[in-house]
Amino acid sequence: MAAAAAAAAAAGDSDSWDADTFSMEDPVRKVAGGGTAGGDRWEGEDEDEDVKDNWDDDDDENKEEAEVKPEVKISEKKKIAEKIKEKERQQKKRQEEIKKRLEEPEESKVLTPEEQLADKLRLKKLQEESDLELAKETFGVNNTVYGIDAMNPSSRDDFTEFGKLLKDKITQYEKSLYYASFLEALVRDVCISLEIDDLKKITNSLTVLCSEKQKQEKQSKAKKKKKGVVPGGGLKATMKDDLADYGGYEGGYVQDYEDFM
């Protein structure tokens, strides 16, 4: 009986030991369940990463991104080229309109020969300016200007200053043989677009200037005549008379003067 009791006690201890052993919580399960304070630190550690089948895939993606950027630049260049073409098209259309106006006769309004010439010159000037602007845009000419060309007068004072600069620029060539003809052509060309009343004002101003110059020229000629020598020995006779008044006779100083002469 005593032996059976001892065996039963030993079996009981073994069962309790097994129970204690298998009742322990699985550390892995406890960590996964968030039972411990430091469980979050290892969270996701065992998750499978998105591992690429081929290590060259990263390089291929980088190459694709690099190839996309030049496409953007090319599209920008295309936009610029399209803008340039549009400008050229508008410029060409404008030139064709000007050329058409130059060639077709004026039917709606009867113009005098002078007015027709003025209109043609004006249109020709517009066409030349249009051609010059197109050439600048085509060849990328820098439009940075200085001095007179940089001025853009709008007020009376601005035009006064602009006129002074133009005068200083032009009058430095007044000694040239072609200066007068140059001014004649210049005044005619710059006055083409003016109204009749404005032309009359300019004409009157030039007429007054011409009258003043004529008066000055006459006065200058009169002064030269007074200072001139009288022909036929008049100056010698006058000096002789003056000496005779001092001497009172034909000898003396007069005779000495004649001997000296």
UniProtKB/Swiss-Prot annotation:
Q: Does the keyword Transmembrane apply?
A: no
Q: Spans of biased composition, class Basic and acidic residues?
A: 65-109
**Sufficient for interaction with EIF3B: annotated segments:** 4-72
Region entry Disordered, spans = 1-113
Q: Which Pfam families match?
A: eIF3_subunit
Localization, UniProt: Cytoplasm
Q: Where is the composition biased (Acidic residues)?
A: 43-64
Q: How does it assemble?
A: Component of the eukaryotic translation initiation factor 3 (eIF-3) complex, which is composed of 13 subunits: EIF3A, EIF3B, EIF3C, EIF3D, EIF3E, EIF3F, EIF3G, EIF3H, EIF3I, EIF3J, EIF3K, EIF3L and EIF3M. The eIF-3 complex appears to include 3 stable modules: module A is composed of EIF3A, EIF3B, EIF3G and EIF3I; module B is composed of EIF3F, EIF3H, and EIF3M; and module C is composed of EIF3C, EIF3D, EIF3E, EIF3K and EIF3L. EIF3C of module C binds EIF3B of module A and EIF3H of module B, thereby linking the three modules. EIF3J is a labile subunit that binds to the eIF-3 complex via EIF3B.
* Record family assignment: Belongs to the eIF-3 subunit J family.
Q: What is this protein called?
A: Eukaryotic translation initiation factor 3 subunit J-A
Organism of origin:
Mus musculus
Task: Output the lineage of the source organism.
Answer: Eukaryota, Metazoa, Chordata, Craniata, Vertebrata
Q: Which gene encodes it?
A: Eif3j1
